[in-house]
Amino acid sequence: MANNRNELNKNLAQMLKGGVIMDVTTPEQAKIAQDAGACAVMALERIPADIRAAGGVSRMSDPAMIKGIQEAVSIPVMAKVRIGHIAEARILQAIEIDYIDESEVLSPADDVYHIDKNRFDVPFVCGAKNLGEALRRVAEGASMIRTKGEPGTGDVIQAVRHMRTMNKQIRELVSLRDDEVYEAAKQLAVPYDLAKYVHDNGRLPVVNFAAGGVATPADAALMMELGAEGVFVGSGIFKSGDPAKRAAAIVQATANWQDAELLARLSENLGEAMVGINEDEIETIMAARGE
């Protein structure tokens, strides 16, 4: 039964392909995201830029706040739990959240083990910097992968690095002889059947989105160019001058990433972009959490 549920969850996540998932902190923001064409929203009390600025321990959001967002929109609602925090995940499943993001943006609850996602009915999203991380999360039951990037910075460089790393490792795995895949699986520290799937199909067994530092329509188009199947936008929208216009532009750019003339028009007069943090200035590297 768990296997059937896992396959169903993977197929559910496929329906989000080509879309944009936006971080929102209020029902009003959720409505702006829905009106802009977001395929889902991520409900959280503080966007990554504020979590980074505040420091301290960041935890799952208040269920009452999440319910307010669920009631405000008809699109799927996601919410984050700390890495390894089984109880937080059970709470979110109990309030009928659509997807759970086991997220490095929050303070990890367990520095060794991730949640056994196969024991849940609700689909999980997890971050990854490379192919090994991605396939380990899939083995644990993740229905969707996203690059970790570096959340709350407005700097897309790490998302680019993670996507390119994953693509390179996939190409390397595809190029191997069949009998070499066993050793590759061992080196990646992943189950053989998942390594074999990538070898045979040239892609992950689940949807792969881009996340971390996407702040402009051009950033979204770049990640699609590099093979992302959709985009998460966190701080980039509601930390900008004109959130509604920027949100709609990023949705359009993600769907039409090959149309440079349209991208040029979408990039005009968007108001002030979020103030970013350069990679060299980052004090806390969130992407290093939960490998």
Curated annotation (Swiss-Prot):
Q: Which residues form a coiled coil?
A: none
**PROSITE patterns associated with the record:** PDXS_SNZ_1 (PS01235), PDXS_SNZ_2 (PS51129)
Catalytic reaction annotation: aldehydo-D-ribose 5-phosphate + D-glyceraldehyde 3-phosphate + L-glutamine = pyridoxal 5'-phosphate + L-glutamate + phosphate + 3 H2O + H(+)
Lyase among keywords: yes
Q: Which Gene3D superfamilies match?
A: Aldolase class I
Q: Which UniProt keywords apply?
A: Lyase, Pyridoxal phosphate, Schiff base
Question: Which residues make up the binding site for D-ribose 5-phosphate?
Answer: 23, 152, 213, 234-235
Which residues are the active-site ones?
Answer: 80
Q: Does this UniProt record's set of keywords contain Cell inner membrane?
A: no
Name a GO molecular-function annotation: pyridoxal 5'-phosphate synthase (glutamine hydrolysing) activity
Q: What Pfam family is a match for this entry?
A: SOR_SNZ
Hey, which pathway is this one from?
Answer: Cofactor biosynthesis; pyridoxal 5'-phosphate biosynthesis
Which positions in this protein are listed as binding D-glyceraldehyde 3-phosphate? 164
Please provide the Gene Ontology terms (biological process) for this protein. Answer: amino acid metabolic process; pyridoxal phosphate biosynthetic process; pyridoxine biosynthetic process
Instruction: Extract the InterPro entries matched here.
Output: Aldolase_TIM (IPR013785), PdxS/SNZ (IPR001852), PdxS/SNZ_N (IPR033755), RibuloseP-bd_barrel (IPR011060)
Top enzyme category: lyase
Protein EC: 4.3.3.6
Its function? Catalyzes the formation of pyridoxal 5'-phosphate from ribose 5-phosphate (RBP), glyceraldehyde 3-phosphate (G3P) and ammonia. The ammonia is provided by the PdxT subunit. Can also use ribulose 5-phosphate and dihydroxyacetone phosphate as substrates, resulting from enzyme-catalyzed isomerization of RBP and G3P, respectively.
**PANTHER family documented for this protein:** PYRIDOXAL 5'-PHOSPHATE SYNTHASE SUBUNIT SNZ1-RELATED
**Quaternary data:** In the presence of PdxT, forms a dodecamer of heterodimers.
Report the sequence similarity comment from the record.
Belongs to the PdxS/SNZ family.
Protein name per Swiss-Prot or TrEMBL = Pyridoxal 5'-phosphate synthase subunit PdxS
Record organism: Bifidobacterium adolescentis (strain ATCC 15703 / DSM 20083 / NCTC 11814 / E194a)
